Design a protein with these regions (language model features):
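Alpha-helical transmembrane segments
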Residues: 39-222
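Helix-capping/transition residues at the boundaries of transmembrane alpha-helices
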Residues: 29-30, 106
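Function-critical hydrophobic alpha-helical transmembrane segments in multi-pass membrane proteins
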Residues: 13-29, 38-39
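Membrane-interfacial amphipathic/re-entrant helices at transmembrane-helix boundaries
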Residues: 1-20, 52-68
Length: 222
């Protein structure tokens, strides 16, 4: 993390950006915790990926231990929240997971390439939340009002897809993206940004297709 702070960027701007990253991730995780199992499965995968990249010379270190602990904790919580929820994580739990994830990303990263790659371990959450924000801005809606426009909410509420299926899909997609980004971390910043952009475009296309189909269906019903 110290290496990130000494690479020629005005430190005040840098600290503000890092603070926004931590605050944003904490809130994004909370906003995405809306169906059974999605927050826990995402936590298992995200912290598992962080643990895999923080393993240093076959020796456990503090960030690796913390990541393993968080992943195991999510796994222990999963039976109570999946496939049918008996206990809910709540705002405190989901915000804690988002905060811890963002801190671990900065902790284990040695350069900005790694920051982008490791932050991408939470790609489905970032993509879904970002698209919902953009949609509401385009519609002129207040961002402070609760909504159900995330793709996972549309799939669950409008398409009546079982929560466990959506949560598993998000987890598997997240795992595949994470494995890809681990392989990409040494290709350079342009390649990483390009990869993330293409992934975001793909996710945006899927998001558009499902919501467009829903609009057409609602028009036919009218």
């Amino acid at each position: 993390f110290q290496d990130l702070m000494t690479k020629g960027v005005v430190w005040i701007v840098l600290y503000v950006l890092l603070a926004l990253f931590i605050i944003g991730t904490s809130n994004f995780y909370n906003f995405m915790d809306g169906i059974d199992g999605i927050a826990a499965i995402t936590g298992i995968v995200a912290f598992g990926l962080i643990a895999s990249v923080s393993w240093n010379n076959d020796q456990l270190n503090m960030p690796c231990l913390l990541a393993i602990g968080m992943s195991v904790s999510c796994f222990g919580f999963l039976p109570f929240n999946f496939p049918s929820a008996k206990v809910f994580m709540g705002d405190v739990g989901s915000i804690l997971l988002g905060f811890t994830f963002s801190v671990l990303v900065l902790w284990v990263s040695n350069n900005w390439n790694e920051v982008l790659c490791f932050a991408g371990f939470l790609f489905p959450f970032y993509a879904d939340e970002t698209l919902s924000i953009l949609e509401r801005i385009i519609r002129g809606e207040a961002l402070t009002i609760p909504h159900r426009r995330h793709l996972y909410q549309v799939l669950a509420n409008e398409y009546n897809i079982a929560h466990w299926k959506i949560s598993i899909f998000y987890g598997l997609f997240q795992l595949l993206v994470g494995i890809l980004l681990i392989q990409m971390k040494d290709v350079g910043i342009v390649g990483i940004i390009g990869t993330l952009f293409l992934l975001f475009c793909g996710f945006s296309f899927i998001n558009f297709k499902f919501k467009r189909k829903l609009q057409i269906r609602n028009l036919i019903k009218q």
